[in-house]
């Protein structure tokens, strides 16, 4: 890594997790000492010691003693954390998030339970917003079993999976799960295959419909992540997504429901970046002066690169179409968009047994 332009907004970055190193960084800065010898810390002028195989210390419990809870912005105290270290699938062609997590360290259910119980008791926090990339169900179920009598509410992020059965969702609900995030991304089998999204691409919609119905029956609010503008994606394939939302909206829209619409970006370090020709990418401007952080300007044989303003405008129109399907009360669309992807969304799902953005109520 030799791109100094990465440091336009910060002085240094931990390339791999190092809890003890973070503590040492604070001590060194406080004492006016150099930081260049801290493991896994990288800066333009001091390269440190990069250790890809360094395990992180799970026993570290966050300390929030310096937070003035009386001035807390949200109506209830919410702790943001994660249960797992990395995505258990880690095969999506568009994603580079796990490219710097080469060790498959598994989180300890026992330690996660201990952490949450400690924070719950010490800080009187009863809401936990877990931002996992994709939490394995075995870990989630073990955690749920350990905290089901703690009277806490929590959110979980995972993948669409046939292991998300009604029985599994019931156990999670009984342990306080209020919100489930799923990286749906698309529903067209060809696009899903190009994404390498799952090993059941042709059954994807059927499994998704079942998960949606079962989550709604368990009073669990949903949030989807969706990618538009994947190279070679056509309007017909985008319409397939719209038709899917129309088919499922009576189920998913009974509870507060939100979607994050992401415009595709070519990510440095992703399988797509390494095998560009396979995806019709004929040019990627990967010189250090051509991009900020990890999204790389590119061109495709389909003339659909998302750096093109006309392409962006067309994709934006599709986002409005999708939103129009999912939010029936049009006057509330700005509120729906502003709440999405925030703890306010989580709190809405915690307390609302109906969808205020639609006209449905649960039986």
Predicted segments with their positions:
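Glycine-rich beta-alpha loop elements in corrinoid/cobalamin-binding modules
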Residues: 1-51, 269
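Flexible glycine/acidic-rich beta-alpha junction loops that bind and position SAM and/or redox cofactors
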Residues: 1-3, 93, 190-195, 228-236, ...
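Structural recognition of alpha->loop->beta junctions
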Residues: 2-24, 174-180, 242-266
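A structural motif corresponding to the C-terminal end of an alpha-helix
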Residues: 9, 122-123, 210-222, 248-254, ...
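Radical SAM [4Fe-4S] cluster-binding motif and immediate context
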Residues: 62-218
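Short, electropositive alpha-helical surface patch
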Residues: 143-153, 232-252
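Glycine/serine-rich loop-strand microenvironments at binding/catalytic pocket rims
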Residues: 206-235, 341-363
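Radical SAM enzyme core and accessory elements
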Residues: 289-363
């Amino acid at each position: 890594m030799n791109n100094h332009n990465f440091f336009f907004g910060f002085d240094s970055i931990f390339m791999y997790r190092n809890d003890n190193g973070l503590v040492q960084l604070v001590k060194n800065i406080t004492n006016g000492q150099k930081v260049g010898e801290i493991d896994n810390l990288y800066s333009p002028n001091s390269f440190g010691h990069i250790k890809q195989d360094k395990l992180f210390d799970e026993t570290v419990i966050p300390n929030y003693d310096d937070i003035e809870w009386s001035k807390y912005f949200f109506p209830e105290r919410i702790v943001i954390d994660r249960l797992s270290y990395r995505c258990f699938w880690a095969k999506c062609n568009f994603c580079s998030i796990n490219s710097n997590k080469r060790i498959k360290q598994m989180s300890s259910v026992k330690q996660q339970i201990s952490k949450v119980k400690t924070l719950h008791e010490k800080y009187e926090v009863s809401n936990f917003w877990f931002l996992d990339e994709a939490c394995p169900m075995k870990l989630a179920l073990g955690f749920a079993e350990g905290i089901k009598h703690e009277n806490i509410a929590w959110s979980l992020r995972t993948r669409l999976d046939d292991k998300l059965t009604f029985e599994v969702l019931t156990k999670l609900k009984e342990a306080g799960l209020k919100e489930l995030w799923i990286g749906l991304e698309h529903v067209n089998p060809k696009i899903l295959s190009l994404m390498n999204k799952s090993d059941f691409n042709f059954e994807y919609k059927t499994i998704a419909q079942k998960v949606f119905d079962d989550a709604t029956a368990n009073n669990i609010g949903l949030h989807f992540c969706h990618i538009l503008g994947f190279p070679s994606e056509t309007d017909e394939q985008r319409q397939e997504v719209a038709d899917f939302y129309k088919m499922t909206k009576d189920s998913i829209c009974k509870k507060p429901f939100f979607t994050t619409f992401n415009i595709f970006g070519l990510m440095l370090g992703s399988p797509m970046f390494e095998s560009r020709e396979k995806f019709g990418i004929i040019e990627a401007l990967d010189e250090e002066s051509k991009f900020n952080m990890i999204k790389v300007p590119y061109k495709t044989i389909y003339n659909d690169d998302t750096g093109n303003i006309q392409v962006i405008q067309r994709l934006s129109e599709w986002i409005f179409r999708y939103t129009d399907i999912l939010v029936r009360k049009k006057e509330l669309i700005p509120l729906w968009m502003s709440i999405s992807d925030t703890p306010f969304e989580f709190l809405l799902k915690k307390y609302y047994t109906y969808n205020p953005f639609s006209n449905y109520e649960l039986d």
